[in-house]
Amino acid sequence: MQTHEIRERFTNHFVKAGHEAVPSASLILDDPNLLFVNAGMVPFKPYFLGQQNPPFPNGTATSIQKCVRTLDIEEVGITTRHNTFFQMAGNFSFGQYFKEGAITHAWQLLTGTVAEGGLGLDPERLWVTVYLDDDEAAEIWNKKIGVPSERIQRLGMADNYWSMGIPGPCGPCSEIYYDRGPEYGAEGGPIADDNRYMEIWNLVFMENERGEGIGKDNFEIVGPLPKKNIDTGMGIERVACILQGVDNVYETDLLRPVINVAEELTGATYGTNDDDNIRFRVIADHSRTGMMLILDGVTPGNEGRGYILRRLLRRIIRSAHLLGAKGKTLEKFMNTIMDTMTPSYPEIADNRERILRVAITEEKAFLKTLASGTELFEDKADQVKNSGNKVLDGAAAFKLHDTYGFPIDLTLEMAAEAGLNVDIEGFNSLMAEQRARAKADNRAKKHGHADLSIYREWVDEHPTVFTGYDELTTDSKVLGLLSAGNKVNEIKAGEEVEVILEASPLYAEAGGQLGDRGQILMGDTVLKVNDVQKIGKKLWVHKATVAQGGLSVGDVVTAQVDSDWRHAARQAHTGTHLIHAALRQVLGPTAVQAGSMNKPGYLRFDFNYTESLTPRQLEEIQNITNQAVDSDWDVNTIETSLEEAKAMGALALFGENYGSEVRVIEVGGPFSIELCGGTHVTHSSQIGPVAILGESSVGSGVRRIEAYTGLDSFKYLAKEQALVENIASSMKVKPEELPDRIAALTQKLKDAEKAIADMRSAQLMAQATGLVAGAIEVNGVKLVAQRVSDVENMGDLRSLAADIKQRLDDVPAVVALVGEDASGKAPFVVGATKAAVSAGYKANAYAKILGQYIEGNGGGKPDMAQGSARNSSGFDQGIAAVKAEMSA
């Protein structure tokens, strides 16, 4: 039975039983602490947690969810039952049926005949486990279903009691196993041998609430839930393995075709030895996982989801090369896995080119890294072995990472294959030093000096009290003063200084928002604050110019925010949140924030996305953003726990470290909810119009949108309007007629360029006729050698040489031409006909000789070579040398 048929039978079974079929969610959800969806129930969490009412008429649902688990990537292929990507088929009940219903549904599908729509498994080969104290489930299996008591085994909390690992719903579970036969292991049921007895379905009975605790079995059960729910998960791949009669999940109809292609590309044979078998399985598994991640919008990167994808793709490439592959392989692997997966995921067809583009680009970059890095690793490994040691030092691992881009995981794998360990502590220490240097360099740029220990006293004992959320003016005591990076007790007019205050209303740069501008006042003393930076997370450093007067440590001053600056900065920051929300509406949840910068009237927003945005997409994003502005929504600030913020659906930067208490900015209810410590407007209409300037690439898989807000947006739009009107006036048309007018002019220009090109081509053909007629003969080979000063570019020169070659195609002939462009450089081309090449007269050899006389370098293939020279005056001498070589 093919995998797609197993999927259909599962869905049909539960739809007939009144469940609503729910499409698989993306592998990428908004949860900042969840790399990928890793269980079938994840998209249903809000219903299980009681945060939302389930929208299913009968209170039941079924889905086949895409899942990725990457905790044990190194184990892929070693165990033959686990994949990094898998399809979890599940049925869910929200306060409807419970244990008996879940058990009955599962048994009917598994043991029902194929003719009746079931999977046709032999009931005599099915075993079940239940939680140690779950007499109810054991009795249902035995009395209602008829499973003999000897095939019902009881296990403790670690195996048969489910929770999410945090306080919330939990409950006992019952697992269904299939006995694959004595050839796979010992008798005795799942307790005795979980290789012979393969788990295929887990039924979770959510009936209790879990309290605090750690691990799978060290937590308190607080009490019963108001409603009893069902969450089940059947592994599609494992059932396919059984129904298709293959030894493991890598040999099913979905993955075996990739192994077949790997055999063709490498010359190795699957099944001959354990090491190669693991590599074949890695290729098959990772090709599918990588393809599905790219499908859902992940791009290779150096952290988070992008790092996982990069690691998977690089393991494929390296495994293929260890098996004997030469050159590029990913395109064929990806095409094969897309063919097998498209019947279940038709959206692959529309994304095929994008998936290939991402994979091929990553492979191209890594192949360069692999060659140079592998050579260094092998040298270091040999040195270690020859010294009698077994540990590759941290410095070598760091160099592989820092210079050659080798992820430490790859170095660890290669070391293990070579029988070596890696000094991971030494590696981590060097990485920490590098990060510290980078931070110090960045801080030095911000503060004008690199020694940050000077702030230690204030960081430890006097963290700044920030008052700027509530007020723009604060009276405060001066705790410290710095001038030229040194502590001082007083400052005077004209100095550039840093001021440490007890409390401040000025915002310190963070979260992409620039530091406030403002003043520090005391009597006649005026300090102009040019920037505010943070040291650590709690100390505000005010960079200021003493405009008049002076200050001493201990003085009480008034710190004042420039209200115009703050207002415009708030407009930009809240505008960034709206653009982020609009982006996700248009592009989907994979368009996650990669960085931002907000300053008065201007914002830029970086996000993970592989392709440039179309004008239509940009227009839609701008329209959604401005509709949100026009809606005059309240902008609410909520201070709450991190757990509660996540429960609200607040977006966060993946991998960012947040405290237990966080600040949530909510605009328009569910439209935009983000964790943010910045300053914001109180109503969305205060942002004013948002004008998107455009979008661009700022790195592999990262795009950037730039926009103006508020008054700057008005100014930009007015400037654009004036520009359009000026252009329309100069063309003597109305502004709305400009597109047609420009299109007409563009077409005229294209026509003129074509006419010029045609004329140029005719001139070249005429010139070719004359050059062929003037050919001389050297050692039985015709030679056309000419300086053509009226041919300025390499394209025309190559065309002329190709034309001459074609006219002399039936005889041995060599063509050598040199031109001269407007800058004085001399492009040159050397060509040879097939007959000449066959006789040993090669264009690339003559190009090198000629280049020596005209101060140039040339290279290429035997039939056509080219180069660029600085001085064509030596052409005649060069041709004489070519003649001599031809006559030799």
Curated annotation (Swiss-Prot):
Keyword tRNA-binding listed: yes
Localization (cell): Cytoplasm
Pfam families: DHHA1, tRNA-synt_2c, tRNA_SAD
EC number: 6.1.1.7
GO biological-process terms attached to the record: alanyl-tRNA aminoacylation
Family under the similarity heading: Belongs to the class-II aminoacyl-tRNA synthetase family.
PANTHER family given in the database record: ALANINE--TRNA LIGASE, CYTOPLASMIC (PTHR11777:SF9), ALANYL-TRNA SYNTHETASE (PTHR11777)
UniProt note: domains: Consists of three domains; the N-terminal catalytic domain, the editing domain and the C-terminal C-Ala domain. The editing domain removes incorrectly charged amino acids, while the C-Ala domain, along with tRNA(Ala), serves as a bridge to cooperatively bring together the editing and aminoacylation centers thus stimulating deacylation of misacylated tRNAs.
Listed name of the protein: Alanine--tRNA ligase
Protein source organism: Corynebacterium diphtheriae (strain ATCC 700971 / NCTC 13129 / Biotype gravis)
